[in-house]
């Protein structure tokens, strides 16, 4: 869906994802889907300026940019939009004052009214496309059963591993 939106709108697009791995994955996916040009990828230390039609970035890489930098974008797409409740992400969205097209995608809306209102303030009305049950019933998602396994360790083992560095 993000790729199709990116192809539909001719204006410059800013795609905000939560991790650097997703910056590279999304850019790679776009190439695989047939996008001929390079997506500009912004991660820590990367040049923030580009004439590319599509910029893919983490919020950590751009939240300190001035409002004037954001004026070049007319489309913003937030992947994993449920993470947009942080102050830095909200500040990015508030700097996009000349950006008429805003899209946020998530499969993990937490259900609280406050969170929903924050997302609607940043992106617009929430549209629920489908549910897990509907995906299972239409055979787009496998039926699954979750078994919880609780592991109980001795106090000695817990104390030994309490200071472990992973």
Residue ranges: model-predicted function:
Residues 19, 57-61, 105-109:
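A short beta-strand-to-loop transition that corresponds to the Sensor-1 phosphate-sensing loop
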Residues 74-75, 82-147:
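Post-DEXD/H (motif II) to motif III coupling segment of the RecA-like Helicase ATP-binding lobe
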Residues 24-25, 50, 64-65, 111-116, ...:
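Switch/connector loops and helix/strand junctions flanking conserved nucleotide-binding motifs
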Residues 3-32, 89, 111:
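Conserved Walker A/P-loop ATP-binding site and its immediately adjacent core
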């Amino acid at each position: 869906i993000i790729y199709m939106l990116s192809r539909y709108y001719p204006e410059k697009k800013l795609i905000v994802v939560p991790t650097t791995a997703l910056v590279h994955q999304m850019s790679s996916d776009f190439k695989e889907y047939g996008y001929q040009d390079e997506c500009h990828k912004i991660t820590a230390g990367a040049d923030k300026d580009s004439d590319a039609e599509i910029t893919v970035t983490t919020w950590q890489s751009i939240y300190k940019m001035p409002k004037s930098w954001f004026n070049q974008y007319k489309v913003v797409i937030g992947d994993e939009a449920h993470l947009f409740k942080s102050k830095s992400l909200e500040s990015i969205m508030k700097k996009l004052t000349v950006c008429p097209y805003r899209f946020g995608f998530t499969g993990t809306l937490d259900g609280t009214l406050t969170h929903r209102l924050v997302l609607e303030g940043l992106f617009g009305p929430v549209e629920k496309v489908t549910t897990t049950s509907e995906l299972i019933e239409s055979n787009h998602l496998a039926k699954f059963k979750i078994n919880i396994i609780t592991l109980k360790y001795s106090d000695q083992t817990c104390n030994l591993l309490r200071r472990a560095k992973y």
